Amino acid sequence: MLKTLKDKKLENCSSINNKSKKQKHIVVGLSGGVDSSLSAALLMEDGWKVEGLTLWLMKGEGSCCSEGLVDAAGLCEDLGIQHNILDSRVIFEREVIKKTTEGYESGYTPLPCSMCNKNVKFEEMLKFVIKQKEFTYIATGHYARVIKSSCEHINNSENFQFKDFLLLRGADRNKDQSYFLYSLSQEVLSRLILPLGDLKKEETRKEALRLGLRTAKKPESQDLCLVEHYGSMQKFIDNHVKTKNGEIKHINGKTLGTHNGIQHFTIGQRKGLGIAWPEPLYVESLDKQKNIVYVANKNDLLKREAIIKEVNWVSIEAPIKEIEVEAQIRYRSEPVKGILVPLKSKDNLTKRFKLIFEDNQSSVTPGQAAVFYKGEILLGGGLISEFSKK
């Protein structure tokens, strides 16, 4: 049966509870993998009327998405549910392929999964549900949780202005995917069910085997869909980003070599620089205007501050004064303490914030997401646009 939160204090706060499942239609986003497959099966077992929805994202036959479509269709046939396919290739091309390309051309290291979640996956699912009318909720196989902010057991010692629904980390910290969901809206959260939020990965496999799902033994995907489609991120870059030769310089100004495009480098990179130096050097920054890759010693990668743009406050109202947060600046990194300071713009809207780390951080990478937490609650997040020295 579908689990709610293991923390009994929060059990009645789950967005699953108190929603009458009788005659409630739910659309499950199916990728063809075990996580989304199990989500659909568990919801059915728990009494929901389920249909599957697969987004057709990639152009060309034989792509990862084509394989996913086949697996998702087979799963729906096994479960005896309707399988819907939504052609989202145009919007995916515009919002993910194009913007990822532009990011690399600008000297950033983009985060395609975040782009897809923000502008494609959840928006397309929401539009589908609203258009069909008989559907009420959407579900995915993400390892994260949604609860109601009215829960009396929520700790709000900082007096945040909580919105109606809160996004929480998944119970399995090793699989937690909330980092990629920071851009979701309250409209999405109000309809979103995450059946795997309280499961560990090993439990997912066991449940899939128990239910006899065809995807139960399917290998877990370790790559972005772009990587699976093109073979590697390098091949994607070669296919989409124009090459422009430039210099590799030490931050002291000495020219050490040349490169064939800043898109081939990312902050903190050590391998593949093709330069000689008495000690290891790392990519310290990328200057798009001058087309220069700057390298430095490891200690020079440490940064004290970063500017975060396009901030979305998913669980709280935008703060008007500085707040203390736990910031996660890479998917697999541990959150670090910091202070977030609002920066006013010309239109007096606060979409940019200065993040001041308690301890200097290495490899602060423009284009990646900085996501802000308070304990298990994801407050919001945005994109790293620039950083300052120690």
Swiss-Prot record:
Disulfide bonds join 116-225. GO terms for molecular function: ATP binding; tRNA binding; tRNA-uridine 2-sulfurtransferase activity. The keyword Oxidoreductase does not apply. Its main location: cytoplasm. The record marks 142, 368 as: Interaction with tRNA. The keyword Disulfide bond applies. ATP binds at residues 29-36, 55, 141. GO terms for biological process: tRNA wobble position uridine thiolation. The active site is at 116 (nucleophile), 225 (cysteine persulfide intermediate). It is found in: Cytoplasm. Keywords: ATP-binding, Cytoplasm, Disulfide bond, Nucleotide-binding, RNA-binding, Transferase, tRNA processing, tRNA-binding. GO terms for cellular component: cytoplasm. Residues 175-177, 330-331 are annotated as: Interaction with tRNA. InterPro entries: MnmA-like, MnmA-like_C, MnmA-like_central, MnmA-like_central_sf, Rossmann-like_a/b/a_fold. Its EC number is 2.8.1.13. It catalyses: S-sulfanyl-L-cysteinyl-[protein] + uridine(34) in tRNA + AH2 + ATP = 2-thiouridine(34) in tRNA + L-cysteinyl-[protein] + A + AMP + diphosphate + H(+). Belongs to the MnmA/TRMU family. NCBIfam families: PRK00143.1, trmU. Catalyzes the 2-thiolation of uridine at the wobble position (U34) of tRNA, leading to the formation of s(2)U34. This is tRNA-specific 2-thiouridylase MnmA. The lineage of its organism: Bacteria, Bacillati, Cyanobacteriota, Cyanophyceae, Synechococcales. The gene is mnmA.
